[in-house]
Amino acid sequence: MKTLRCLFFLLTFAFPAFAQIEGNPENFCRNGFFPRESSEYKLASVKGGKNEKVYFYDDSGDCPNDENCRRKSYLIPNDEVIVSRNFGKWACGWYQPKKGSETVGWIALDKLEFKETSRNPARGDWLGAWNYAGNQIEIGKGKTADSLTITGDAFWKGLGDNVHVGELDDTSKPAGNELKIGENETGEYDCKVTMRLLGKYLIVSDNLQCGGLNVTFSGVYQKK
């Protein structure tokens, strides 16, 4: 990696915000794990009758296989969701509204119609300023026809003025719809990032070594 800088402002003790995916119950479906739990994400549209509500279901206890697991949040026909994996008759879905935060949870599989997406996107599809929850990733043209430059900023804000940040600055070549940073790094604390282009979404996952404590670039990004 060309450059990775980690800055700490008023560093204080804090508990890690992310647990390891290994060992999680099979019924877990949460936004913190979503960008890192699959390598085969899919796009789907919600289907249903006029004015039908397709509800999200919780992942606690014996959920989602119980009506008591039904949340208040719901989707309507033609809403677009990203699916990471299936669990029985359920799909773990991420819905990103035009404004506001995402909703992640179990959705009935029979209420989804999956879409075909390109596994070999054009170079231009990668280019631009991508944003998720205040984190930013900028992808530009590299010096060679098949390379891309990647810069980024991420932060985690704790109590008061306690802020931890991380930066990306590298060049890489996409392989299909994947773009990786630090793939050949061998150090225990080297930053590694995988970006997957899925339609208008950039699904980013890292190894939690790309910045200060609790900083991660993981998330589902969209162009500004």
Identify the role of each PLM range.
Residues 2-9:
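Sec-dependent signal peptide recognition
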